[in-house]
From Swiss-Prot:
Keywords: Cytoplasm, DNA-binding, Endoplasmic reticulum, Lipid-binding, Membrane, Metal-binding, Nucleus, Phosphoprotein, Receptor, Steroid-binding, Transcription, Transcription regulation, Zinc, Zinc-finger. Heteromultimeric cytoplasmic complex with HSP90, HSP70, and FKBP4, in the absence of ligand. After ligand binding, it translocates to the nucleus and binds to DNA as a homodimer and as a heterodimer with NR3C1. Binds the coactivator NCOA2. May interact with HSD11B2 in the absence of ligand. Binds the coactivators NCOA1, TIF1 and NRIP1. Zn(2+) 2 binds at residues 639, 645, 655, 658. This is Mineralocorticoid receptor. Residues 669-725 are annotated as: Hinge.
Amino acid sequence: METKGYHSLPEGLDMERRWGQVSQTVEHSSLGSTERTDENNYMEIVNVSCVSGAIPNNSTQGSSKEKHELLPCLQQDNNRPGILTSDIKTELESKELSATVAESMGLYMDSVRDADYSYEQQNQQRSMSPAKIYQNVEQLVKFYKENGHRPSTLSCVNRPLRSFMSDSGSSVNGGVMRAIVKSPIMCHEKSPSVCSPLNMTSSVCSPAGINSVSSTTASFGSFPVHSPITQGTPLTCSPNVENRGSRSHSPAHASNVGSPLSSPLSSMKSSISSPPSHCSVKSPVSSPNNVTLRSSVSSPANINNSRCSVSSPSNTNNRSTLSSPAASTVGSICSPVNNAFSYTASGTSAGSSTSRDVVPSPDTQEKGAQEVLFPKTEEVESAISNGVTGQLNIVQYIKPEPDGAFSSSCLGGNSKINSDSPFSVPIKQESTKHSCSGTSFKGNPTVNPFPFMDGSYFSFMDDKDYYSLSGILGPPVPGFDGNCEGSGFPVGIKQEPDDGSYYPEASIPSSAIVGVNSGGQSFHYRIGAQGTISLSRSARDQSFQHLSSFPPVNTLVESWKSHGDLSSRRSDGYPVLEYIPENVSSSTLRSVSTGSSRPSKICLVCGDEASGCHYGVVTCGSCKVFFKRAVEGQHNYLCAGRNDCIIDKIRRKNCPACRLQKCLQAGMNLGARKSKKLGKLKGIHEEQPQQQQPPPPPPPPQSPEEGTTYIAPAKEPSVNTALVPQLSTISRALTPSPAMILENIEPEVVYAGYDNSKPDTAENLLSTLNRLAGKQMIQVVKWAKVLPGFKNLPLEDQITLIQYSWMCLSSFALSWRSYKHTNSQFLYFAPDLVFNEEKMHQSAMYELCQGMHQISLQFIRLQLTFEEYTIMKVLLLLSTVPKDGLKSQAAFEEMRTNYIKELRKMVTKCPNNSGQSWQRFYQLTKLLDSMHDLVNDLLEFCFYTFRESQALKVEFPAMLVEIISDQLPKVESGNAKPLYFHRK
C-alpha cells in the first residue's frame, strides 16, 4: 500500500514564509529501488519546464508503479552543507537526472489525479496527442532503466554551483505536498552564466480567471532557476544560448500534462503551460490578490535592484535560488565576471507594466553574442492596507555582505510597497531622505530654521526681539513683520494660505465669544492660563494684543481682569445696551449677561469642573479653599519629589506643595478678591453724592403773559436750559482720574517659559530671568508710551528715563507680584517661575533675592493698595536722570510734581489713613528711596554677568542688550543721578 505524506497547511498560506527559509544547500543523491520504501515515498512535486514531448499527458495505474521505482530522491539538507563537485560529468549522467525529473512528474500527475480537484480551463491549449506524449515517456523510462541509477553531480565549466531549492507546496485535500526540484542539467559552453529570462516558463494564468499560481522553474541557460516569478509569457531562448538542456517551452514546443482520467480540454493539471493554455494549477504560492511578478535577470549595466533570487557561495545568509561562483553580491542571476546584479522593480497600481532593458554581459560579448533584450513584466496587485500608496518613494536597499559590492535603486513615483514580499530578512526598506513626491524639488532648505537658537550672545539685535526703545516709543519700525510663517520651511512644502477668511474680524459679532454667532457659524476659542478667552486668529492679528492700552468699547474683551467692576462689565462680550429701564434690577441684568450658551469651564489647577472665578482664576471650589488656607495659614509645604508632581482631579491632594505652586502659576492671588470689594465700595460712594445733588433749576416761562411757571417734561428738555448742565455733569463724571488710567494700562503678567526638565543651575536660572526681563521690558516700554504726560517729553528723554529706571521698575513689580500672589512668602517672578529659598541659593544671587523679598515684606507692613502701587511705579520711572539733566527738564519736573501730588491725594482719600495721611506718605516715599540702594546692587551684578556672558553661559535677549549697552558706560562713569525724597 502506498503511503502519501501530507502537510496540513492551509492553501495559499505560509508559502512565502517558507520560500525565505529555503536551506542554503541541496544534496543530490539517487537511491536504488531496493532502498526505497513506502515511507520514503513522499509526494514530492516539482514544477519544472520540460522539452517538448518529454512529459506525458496521460498515465496509467500500471505505469505509475514503474515510476515509483525509477524515482530518485533529491533531498534538502538544512543542517549540513552539500557542495557539488567540480568534475565535468558525461552527458549520460545528466540524462539520468532528466529521467528523475520525468519520473517525479509522473508522481505529480498521480497525486493530482488522486486529489480529484476540478480545475477550470480558461483557454484551449495547443497540445500534442496524449498517446504520442506517453509513448515518448515510456521510451525514456526504458532507456534510463537500462543504464541504472547512481549518484551524479552537477558541474558547470569547473565552477562550483550551489543551488538553493525552494520548497513549494501543492495543497491536496487540505494538505500540502512537498515539492523538490530534481533537474540538474549540464551547462553547455555556449550557455554563459548570464542568461535572459527568455527561457523562463511560467504557469501564471490571465488575471481575470486565475485561481492559484504555482511556483515556477525558470531555465537559466541549462540550469533550473527557482524563484517565485510568475512570468506572464514564456519566451524562447536568445540565439546565443543553446536550448538543448532547457526545460522552457516556447509556443511551438508547448506540451500539456493532464490526468488520464479527464479530458485535456476539461481539466488541465499541469504545472507547466504555454501562453495559449493559461492553465490553472492548484498551488499555495499565492492568490490573485498577492501575485507578484519579479524579473530575475540583470547585468552590470543595471543598477536598479529590487528583488533577488540568487546569491554567491560566499553569501550564505541570503535566500535565493541560484548562485554563480564569482557572484559576491545579491542579484537574481549573476555572471562569473560580474559582481553586482540587479533588476528594476516596477509595480504600478493599475496592473502590470513592461520595461525593456538592454543587458550586455562580458561573457556573451566575448562569445560573439550581441545585446539581448529582456522584456520584464512585473505586477503588484496588493498594496499596504489595501490602499493606494502612490507617491510614497521608498528606496529598497539590498544589504550586501562585507566582501560584496552594493547597488541600490530608487523606485518610481508610482510604486507600491508589496507587503507580501517573501524576503523577510535581507531586504531593508528605507524612506528616501530627499523624497520629492514624484516632482522635481528645487527648494533650498534654510540652514537654521530656528534663528533664535543661535549660540552667540552678542547677536541679539538680529535674532529675537524686533522691538527697540525707539521703535516702540517712536514711529513703528519699518519692515517689521510679526508673522513668522514660512521662515523655517523649505519652498517645496505646501503651506495653507493664511488669508484670514475663516475668521473675518469685520463680520464677527460681539456674541461670538460664546462660541456661535448669530448666523449659526461656530468659532474656536480657548481658555488660557488666566481665564483668557481668545478667538482663533492669524499670527499677525494676535501679536501683543494684551498690550493694547485703550481697547475700543465694542471690541471683545480678552481678559477677565480682577480690578473692580471692569471685569464684570466687559468680560461677557455682549453688545452694550443703549437704554436700560429703571425698573430692571441688577439681578435681571446679571442673568441676561450670563446666558446658557457660555462654554463650560474647567479648573486651571486640577482640571475639574470649575465653579467660578476665584481669586482671579477660574478654579473649582476645592482649589479655591486650598489656596485660601495655604496662603492665609502661611504653610511651608515641601515636595517629596522634584517639585513636578502631577496635579489633577484624582492626585491633587497628594502633594500640597506642587498644588500651591500650580495655583500660583495659574495666577491665583488674594488681592483679586480685595480689589473687587474695594471696587464695589467705590461704586457705592460715587452714587451717594449724585443722589444728594439738587435738581436743576426750572426753565423760565415761555411767554411773559403766563403767570405760572411751566416745567418741561423730562423727555423733552429745553436745549438752552436743561441739556447743557446735564452734559457738563456727564463730562465731568466721564473724565477718568489718573489712578483709573494707571489701573487700565497696567501690563499683564508675563510667563517666563521656564523648563522644569532642565537642572536648576545658575546659568539656566539666570538665562531664564534675563529672557523674562526682556519680555517685561517690552511691556514696560509700551506702558510708558501711553502714560499720561510721558508722551509730552522728547523721544531722547523718554529713552533715557527708561534706560536708567528699567531695573528699578522690574524689581518693584516683582515685589508687588510676590505680595499679591504669595503673600510675600516667595519671589513671584512669573506664574511658571516662583523662587523659594532653594532656588534663591541656586541662582547665585541669594542676597539680592533677599533684598527684593524685604521690599515685598514692606508691602505687607504698609498694606499697600493697587492705586498706590501704580502711582509709586510712575515715580520710580521718573526717579533717575542724567547729571547734565534732560533736554526738556521743565516738562519732566512738571510731570513728576503732578504724580507726587496724585500720590498725596490718594493717601488722603484713603479712609484708613484718617489723621495719619502725612505719616503714610512719608513711609511710602521712604520706601521709594530704599529702592535705589537695592537697584545699585542689582545693576552691579547684572553688568558683571553681561560682560562675562560667554564664560558664564548666560543669555541676554536683544532688548536687554540694547538697554544695558547704553546704560553701562553712563552708570559706571557716574552720569546717573538718583532723585531722593529724603536726604540720607
